[in-house]
């Protein structure tokens, strides 16, 4: 494997109980500093694959390597180097921006509150407003 390979997904499979859906032989390679978008029809497995990559779901089989090393589903270290934008924010709608900062500080060891609040200030977002009121 070339050392510029950041993430390698090789023949990853997932099938849900009581469902006809199958993610079959999903494979992709992402190089360092590369931005990737997953495109496909509804139900093709895009969200399932992303959820496997970030540890929200377990794969049935196949391999996922980060800089050439296989990582377990609960392994947080490599996930801090992957950015994912979901269709919905995976935090309760009743939280405020200040609350989100506290939550993310507890999850991500590399969370940068200063950068976060610099962006909040730049976009002129109110700190005490619940996130459910913001547009996507």
What do these predicted ranges mean?
Residues 86-136:
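ABC-family P-loop ATPase nucleotide-binding domains
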Residues 37, 80-87:
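ABC nucleotide-binding domain signature
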Residues 54:
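Helix-to-loop junction immediately C-terminal to a conserved catalytic motif
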Residues 2-26, 75:
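A short, flexible loop at the N-terminus of ABC-type nucleotide-binding domains that lies
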Residues 26-37:
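Pre-Walker A (P-loop) beta-loop-beta motif of ABC nucleotide-binding domains
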Residues 62-73, 78:
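Conserved ABC transporter NBD signature motif
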Residues 39-41:
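The feature captures the beta-strand-to-loop junction immediately N-terminal to the Walker
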């Amino acid at each position: 494997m070339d050392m510029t390979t950041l993430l390698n997904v090789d023949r990853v499979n997932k099938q849900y109980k009581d469902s006809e859906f199958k993610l079959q032989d999903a494979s992709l390679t992402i190089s360092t500093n590369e931005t990737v978008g997953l495109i496909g029809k509804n139900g093709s497995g895009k969200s399932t694959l992303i959820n496997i990559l970030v540890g929200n779901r377990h794969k049935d089989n196949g391999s996922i390597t980060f800089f050439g090393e296989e990582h377990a589903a609960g392994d947080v270290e490599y996930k801090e180097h992957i950015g994912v934008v979901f269709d919905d924010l995976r935090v309760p709608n009743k939280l405020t921006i200040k609350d989100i900062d506290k939550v993310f500080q507890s999850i991500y060891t590399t969370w940068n509150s200063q950068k976060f609040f610099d962006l909040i200030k730049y976009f002129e977002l109110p700190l005490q407003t619940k996130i459910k009121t913001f547009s996507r």
